[in-house]
Every structure is written in structure tokens, then in C-alpha cells.
Amino acid sequence: MSASAATGVFVLSLSAIPVTYVFNHLAAQHDSWTIVGAAAVVLLLVALLARVLVKRKPPRDPLFYVYAVFGFTSVVNRIIGLEQDGIIDGFMTHYLREGEPYLNTAYGHMICYWDGSAHYLMYLVMVAAIAWEESYRTIGLYWVGSIIMSIVVFVPGNIVGKYGTRICPAFFLSIPYTCLPVWAGFRIYNQPSENYNYPSKVIQEVQAKDLLRRPFDLILVLCLLLATGFCVFRGLIALDCPAELCRLYTQFQEPYLKDPAAYPKIQMLAYLFYSVPYFVIALYGLVVPGCFWMPDITLIHAGGLAQAQFSHIGASLHARTAYVYRVPEEAKIIFLALNIAYGVLPQLLAYRCIYRPEFFIKTKADEKVE
């Protein structure tokens, strides 16, 4: 494959601009099932066009076509975000009203922007890596964590939230959106991981240091303990804990946790049942040397938390959230400090694991013991 294939995917994704404009005007004249069928045909055509782009030298990695289609949908989501902000008009108006009305929520707005910016850049990078036959395992795992987190919160939230009674046929488009990332995640994880060529002496010296002699790791451990408590606390709020502290926090700090849209509740439950176990495992990995799996799970978790906190913070402050559920003006500084710190911590841990991995490398002695 050549670099022109990656450029072709980029141009193909931009075709979403005229396609959505035409699609919106045609959709206004047909019923919901016709809209779903037409949308499915469009996505299939995008995949076929991506195949035509690389017909002479097709890629070895079939995920090339998945990223091409998802890149197209990322531009669609960016268009939705711009239309919701009133910057453009007439591109997705009918679809937002009749197809997926839950995208009009503050949370829906934020994930559209995340998908149309962060995910879009990841797709372009991964497509370029495939075209140049380079490894993209690191950014791939980060993307897997990000998109899986959005699926875990967004799809159930559409069903159990206030829009649960307005589920339209377009909801079935979520099926490939859910299945393909899971399949992609397994393929990315099974790609060869990076080989670190550190001298055995260096690895042994690093792994011989206890936690007190690794100040940055010690700070990370303390922060992980605090983050675990924060996760459990907000998880209890999502479970309607009657404690006075939970009530006061919800009333004066994060009233958005009680939003009937259900996205914040599901997000807190995802933190409780996903992040808390991860934090416990990460604490173990920072204390016990040779946990070779730490970089991978840390990347996945960092991607998930980046998407989750971007969406949660944005939706908590967004004008589309009812005033009574928005963060009070006097609480914004504390709210932002807590939530930004909580979102940055996994990124710092991922950076530490990827760029200073000596402590996590399995030594030959460990392999012999196994």
C-alpha cells in the first residue's frame, strides 16, 4: 500500500459533508425504516469505495476498512455537533429529530464532538500506519478503551433514560457500532507488542527498588487510592445512597448525577465496576515488578477515561442540560479540579508505563519460574 491510500480515506471521509446534506433532504420525505436502510447502504458504499482505493495492493489488515467507515461516521458526528451549535444548518436536522433524538442531549452533543475530533484523528493515524505497514498497537488500544467506554454508557443510556420510550429504528445502527470495535479490539491486542531491548542489569536494578525509592510511582499509588475512593463515592450516589454526604454532594457539587437522561448514572456505575477493579490491579502492578500486562490495560483504561471525563465534564456544564442539573456557579472550580485531576491521572499512568517500562518487563528468571 502507498500513502495515497491513506489520503484517499481522508478524502472519502470528507464526502460525508455533501452526503449528509442530500440524505437529510431525502429523509424528510420517507419513513424511519427507509432512513435506516439508506444509512446502511451509504456505510456499505463507503466500505466498498475504500476497497476500490486499495484494489491494486489491498492491506493485510482488514481493520483498514473499519477505520475508513468509522472515519466517515466521525465526520458525520462532527457535522451533528456543528449543527447542534447552530454553526451550520440543514445537514442532519431531520435525522436528529426523527432518527436519534437522544443525540440532542448534552451528553450526545459531547460524544459527537469527541468522535468527530479525537476518534477521527485516531482513525487517520491508524489508516496511515496500515498504509505504511507500521505498528499502531499503542494508539489502537487507546482507541479501543475510548470507544468501548462510549458504547458502554451511550447505548444503555438511550434505553433506560428519558428517551427510552422514543427508541427509533435508527437505534439498530448501534449494532455494528458496538460489535466492530469489540472485534477490532481483539485483533489489535493480538498484534505483536513492542520489544524493549533493555540490558538485564538495568531491568534488575529498577525492579530491585521498592516503592519508597520510586517517588513518582509512590505519588501515583497515593493518587490511585484517592481516585478509588472518589469512584466508589460517586458510584454510591448513582445507586441512590441515602447518606447525608451523598445528598449534599449531589445538591451542591454535581446535580448532573441526577439527570433523568441516565447517562451520568451509567457513567458512575461504569467507573465503579470498571475503574475501581482497574485501580486495584494497577496498584498491584506498581508494587510488584514484572507485571508485563500493565502497559496494555493502562492504555485501554486511559482511553476510556479520556472519553468519559471529556463527555461528563462537558455535559455537566452544557446549556442543553437543564439548569437544575448543571454544576452551580460557585462549585465550578472544585468540580473542574476534581474531574480534570481524575481524568489526567490515567494519562500520567499510561505515559509512565509506556515510556518507562523497565519495572514491568518480565525477566528471564520470572519466565523460568513460570
Curated annotation (Swiss-Prot):
Domain of life: Eukaryota
Keywords: Lysosome, Membrane, Repeat, Transmembrane, Transmembrane helix
Keyword match Transmembrane: yes
Location in the cell: Lysosome membrane
Topology class, membrane: Multi-pass membrane protein
Principal location listed in the UniProt entry: membrane
Pfam families cross-referenced by the UniProt entry: EBP (PF05241)
Ranges that cross the membrane: 3-23, 34-54, 62-82, 110-130, 139-159, 166-186, 218-238, 268-288, 331-351
CDD domains for the chain: TM6SF1-like
Domain (EXPERA): residue spans on this chain: 60-185, 216-350
Keyword presence, Repeat: yes
Family: Belongs to the TM6SF family.
Function in brief: May function as sterol isomerase.
PANTHER family: TRANSMEMBRANE 6 SUPERFAMILY MEMBER 1 (PTHR14568:SF10), TRANSMEMBRANE SUPERFAMILY 6 MEMBER 1/2 (PTHR14568)
Name of the featured protein: Transmembrane 6 superfamily member 1
